[in-house]
């Protein structure tokens, strides 16, 4: 900077709250203060991060986690010179920019073109100057002549390029090979060359290769159109205009205003989904249970290099399911299970799912319990068809028409699939798959072409040995698959129809027999494998059976020749091999969910409908951190489940730690950022193929098969991988007339009885509530919440409460009485315990109604000996502590975005207990400042397994990070346990 400080317009930086990383030039600080900028000592409060060092960890977390703009000090200087705040996009110090580390000398270009090139280079992280000296890395010159050119030729450290190199790098968003843009490669037409010789001298600046240190001063992008200097490759004015137009368009789409980009890197997976789920529920209905996040394994090691990543198949957690309530009732293995008590069901929900993957077999919520009552009592109406929480799915928007660019790989992919499907034993394809084995059920083995660490070799060898034994059994036992029908020639020039397969058709029931919708499982006899071993509560298996029987099916306790279907998770088991030998239909609980929604026995048609090709606990994607874009509702949930089954971590946000982005379309902010950060972008088939045994796909993220987007059904399985699994579906399931005549299903409700079906809303409808007979003063009016009851029971309680003059509390903060029959880990219970005066049983309300006044609560306080033993606490003591002082008073919490239960739920629980939740991640410096200064509030870090990559710096510096139980169990027991729930 020059010694003279430029005049700063008054209040120019008034809206800027800056956080300085590293040492800044004192004059930059002076300019900021003169413009009324405010320095903050905590980066979460900043609007701008100012730093020269783009590799500083604080800069990385500001961009990746908080999505804050990070600028170089030159942004301040040039903003002052221009008299206005410049866009932050062109001032990033980070090394991910196209021209980072480049200092270019511009020579022999017109002033207009020089301004344009200067702007392009500096905007994308480079530097420009007019003098050729030791600082220069590139010489930008349109012709192979001049003193600077001759000097640069003698220096191997200086690369010589034409201006086209700058334009092409920007248009393709990557640094191009300079050797292809050397000016001597240009071929000139003679006439134009002569014109150029006449004009060139006037446009060329002095060609002095001196070693002076003058750096050309930076300037903001010029708004003028660049005028040509005469050289053909760069000179046409239309070309310059076009390039600049594309540049501005690309930049605006890349780094549009902060408010648009703010949702990219810090997108809590849970918060919007919870809101969306509530929108799909009937008015007033709440999600049944909190999915209290589960496994808390040790902090994983660093991400392995690409050649090793994904090939480790580590035994570990059992395979589990998706986030929103999705199938029947939760099962869980015992892997340091986080303790959990359910709310309005006697069935205990055990949560050992990862934070972003809720239970595929979730505890039955009120609608499904209604189904059980219908099954048991027959007077209610037909059994509900949905085991999965009965969330009404909003129609998914149809994908936009694909441009020709994307149609071509899609057509090629379909042609390849059609051609391969026509051959009983397809020849080795030239792309993703290794040569198919002779036996149609065999799956490709994980490749061993690259050296593996000893632990990975051992685990991989163990998996291969299991698969080999499994495949040998299949070779001995499996019948020859039915002959395949000839198909159209593979040389067809048009893609086949979506459902055109060279296979015999697939059937559910015999098409000639009409099956009643209520009994769509007639003739199906299920045996269940894999799942029972993972169910901590054996009552859940009985629930499955009741639901299957309610739709005409049957469940046998053991596998027998009578069985038609095997419900299983993995293809690697003796029971699965026996079922395949006997040509039984082998499907998953996810398929059962699908047919329950459709009320029709349809063949499996998604990758999740088939058992996985590795043993339970096998994790082919254990080193992957996956994010998705373009998928909504059920499709997004399916991808979460697929990621979990494959052993990958799932994040709802995208940051540089992600290893794969699964896209529906090659569009959107996440996609653009993934390309910028060189994160592979694949379609959903990539993950489906891995689940079904094509482990070679782990190293094929760049193959055309997995980068063809806009597929009609991205979740459809690859035909070659499921040929044998679909074999049993080529024969229709026959249902005898005796079975059709003899079946008795729950009767349909009569038309006049429909209105009497109990409402699902926990709040009584306004018209059902009588006006209060007593009017109490606000101080004497109880504000009540109910938790753990059936909706119809809650409605009756609310009527009595209103008659007595009480009110239903709008929120836990305004609640004075919580009515519950037992201790439950619901949102209401865990928020109310910190603020209510009394937690009482329903008998208190009954006694009040009997006496027609509110009676003393002491004789009706809730006592739950079982829960108090389980959690080693006293509810009475917890309430006493909460009344004495809020548990989290004077404490700040930072909770990572992928936490489970959702961020909004955790925030409500923390705030009711007196704490505050920070919206942005605190820096190490800020944490140490709060830790060492006792007058500052303590900052507690809460995370989950899927977000541990966001906490690497904390672990490296020995800072404790806790799981959600620090909060959940903490508020229940009203204690702070800093040891039991921290990640090691």
From Swiss-Prot:
Family annotation (Pfam families): BRCT, BRCT_2, PTCB-BRCT, RTT107_BRCT_5
Comp. bias intervals (Acidic residues): 188-208
GO cellular component, one term: nuclear matrix
Record region (Interaction with TP53BP1): 505-984
Keyword terms: Chromosome, DNA damage, DNA recombination, DNA repair, Nucleus, Phosphoprotein, Repeat, Transcription, Transcription regulation
Bias kind Polar residues: ranges: 752-761
Family matches, as InterPro entries: BRCT_dom (IPR001357), BRCT_dom_sf (IPR036420), DDR_Transcriptional_Reg (IPR051579)
Coiled coil: none
Primary residence: nucleus
Taxonomic superkingdom: Eukaryota
Motif Nuclear localization signal: where in chain: 583-600
Any one GO BP annotation for this protein: negative regulation of DNA-binding transcription factor activity
Function: Involved in DNA damage response and in transcriptional regulation through histone methyltransferase (HMT) complexes. Plays a role in early development. In DNA damage response is required for cell survival after ionizing radiation. In vitro shown to be involved in the homologous recombination mechanism for the repair of double-strand breaks (DSBs). Its localization to DNA damage foci requires RNF8 and UBE2N.
Subunit (UniProt): Interacts with the C-terminal transactivation domain of PAX2. Forms a constitutive complex with PAGR1 independently of the MLL2/MLL3 complex. Interacts with TP53BP1 (when phosphorylated at the N-terminus by ATM). Interacts with HLTF. Component of the KMT2 family MLL2/MLL3 complex (also named ASCOM complex), at least composed of the HMTs KMT2D and/or KMT2C, the common subunits ASH2L, RBBP5, WDR5 and DPY30, and the complex type-specific subunits PAXIP1/PTIP, PAGR1, NCOA6 and KDM6A; required for the association of PAGR1 with the MLL2/MLL3 complex.
Segments forming domain BRCT: 8-93, 94-183, 516-609, 616-704, 781-862, 883-924
Originating species: Bos taurus (Bovine)
Protein's name according to its UniProt entry: PAX-interacting protein 1
Free-text note on domains in this protein's UniProt record: The BRCT 1 and 2 domains mediate the interaction with PAGR1A.
Modified residues annotated as Phosphoserine in this record: 227, 235
